[in-house]
UniProtKB/Swiss-Prot annotation:
Belongs to the G-protein coupled receptor 1 family. Residues 51-58, 122-140, 221-237, 294-316 are cytoplasmic. The chain crosses the membrane at residues 27-50, 59-80, 102-121, 141-159, 198-220, 238-260, 274-293. GO terms for cellular component: membrane; plasma membrane. Odorant receptor. One of its GO terms (biological process) is detection of chemical stimulus involved in sensory perception of smell. PROSITE patterns: G_PROTEIN_RECEP_F1_2. It is a multi-pass membrane protein. The gene is OR1K1. This is Olfactory receptor 1K1.
């Protein structure tokens, strides 16, 4: 009975990671270190280029800068600990460390989702309402969209963490993951977790699904507008405006769905860990590449930043 009511204080967990094979750990360390450094450099350069270039002081780039900053932080929540565990023998993490990691993982993941929805709305306004675009996507409107994204995500995350902190853990403390995700921890708890599971399927799903539905609605309206354009060049220009965003949305939500809307067998759990790597490590690294490949203004700002040349709005 004492074990069943074990206090949460002093508890530590063991992160089992992606593999227990010593022969795979060093190659994985090198791979993920390269991906992480590329993510930091890519997203950091995007933020710096947007700040340094007056030509990029526009709503879509303001939102992109916040997305890149969120991606930079998102990768930093899980990857450093994963890299350390690939080299160290001690894979333990305290309960406080686990909850802290989970808090920022939830918060930054939802921030990404909300910012992608805000960027879809920006694309919608740019294509469907080009004349009043400056009024509809004013500085105040952009600040409100970004502020709402950060506020909603942190309130959502705080709610989860306050509930998770009340759980007791009396079974094995081995977490079959490379970071503290909520589902593995819920399976280790000996408390009644029905209220948290209910929250995940209601509030949690709403926080993730609502931005996704807004993105679908925005792109539905965009598609209808594009089909009405008389010239092929106009349609191509409209598609290129939002092509990079659509690629990022597909990558992000594709992997999220693969992780959180799947069965719970061992094979699916293993695939879930691989998919989690995709949206916590690979997607933040690919986003700057996708946006710079599709956008000449970003390419020009990055070149100017790297060679130390200052560009003005007239250079665009």
């Amino acid at each position: 009975m004492e074990a069943a009511n074990e206090s949460s204080e002093g508890i530590s967990f063991v992160l089992l990671g992606l593999t227990t094979s010593p022969g795979q750990q060093r190659p994985l360390f090198v791979l993920f270190l390269l991906l992480y450094v590329a993510s930091l450099l890519g997203n950091g350069l995007i933020v710096a280029a947007i700040q340094a270039s007056p030509a990029l002081h526009a709503p879509m780039y303001f939102l992109l800068a916040h997305l890149s900053f969120a991606d930079l932080c998102f990768a930093s929540v899980t990857v450093p600990k994963m890299l350390a565990n690939l080299l160290a023998h001690d894979h333990s993490i305290s309960l406080a460390g686990c909850l802290t990691q989970m808090y920022f993982f939830f918060a930054l993941g939802v921030t990404d989702s909300c910012l992608l929805a805000a960027m879809a709305y920006d694309c919608y306004v740019a294509i469907r309402h080009p004349l009043p675009y400056a009024t509809r996507m004013s500085r105040a409107m952009c600040a409100a969209l970004v502020g709402m994204a950060w506020l909603v995500s942190h309130v959502h995350s705080l709610l989860y963490i306050l509930l998770m902190a009340r759980l007791s853990f009396c079974a094995s403390h081995q977490v079959p993951h490379f970071f503290c995700d909520h589902q593995p921890l819920l399976r280790l708890s000996c408390s009644d977790t029905h209220h948290i599971q209910l929250l995940i399927f209601t509030e949690g799903a709403a926080v993730v699904v609502t931005p996704f539905l807004l993105i679908l609605a925005s792109y539905g309206a965009i598609a209808a507008a594009v089909l009405q354009l008389p010239s092929a060049s106009g349609r191509l220009r409209a598609v290129s405006t939002c092509g990079s965003h659509l690629a990022v949305v597909s990558l992000f939500y594709g992997t999220v769905i693969a992780v959180y809307f799947q069965a719970t067998s061992r094979r699916e759990a293993e695939w879930g860990r691989v998919a989690t790597v995709m949206y916590t490590v690979v997607t933040p690294m690919l986003n700057p590449i996708i946006y710079s490949l599709w956008n000449r203004d970003v390419q020009g700002a990055l070149r100017a930043l790297l060679i130390g040349r200052r560009i003005s709005a007239s250079d665009s």
